[in-house]
Amino acid sequence: KNEMGRKLYDFHLHCCYITGLLHGDPQNGNYLFKRDQIILLDFGNIHKLSLDFRKNYIGFLRAIENVDMTAYQFYGKNLGVLTTEDDQEFLAKHFALATAIFSPFDQVGIFPPPLDNPLHLIHQFVKGIKLKGTHRPCGELATIDRTHLGLYTKLRAWNSHLDWKGPKDRILWEFENNLK
């Protein structure tokens, strides 16, 4: 399960950031898992992530990792999750939520998916804010979040022990290096 989990994670990262072609429905019936390979069976829900989206999403992830609130606000606005009208309290809560969800995957080492239920964190956040009349994030963000959650759920069920940071850092470096 660790080796298949690593392959699935590597495939996911490559699709998200290098090709920009993302499978939007990563449930079990859409993959065939064999001893030494993963075969994608269903191509009916493939989404193209724009170059601008990928740049902004990576900037957003880097802002979380570097605890850079200025960059977080900049990229959050570009992704449609933050606006210029958001007050400091909302920004602080939003940053705390994003940090709770993403920063465990920035730790060095090999370990299983670190969160029991990331949706619980989101539910707690949403309970404390007024949603009526608020903005909506871009569709690409919803697509990548859904795919991340599907991957996370699969790897959690397998209890795959992975190096989360190393492969992600290599893929993000490759993406950024290809921009030069």
Predicted regions and their residues:
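Short amphipathic alpha-helical surface micro-motifs
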Residues: H14, L22, Q124-F125
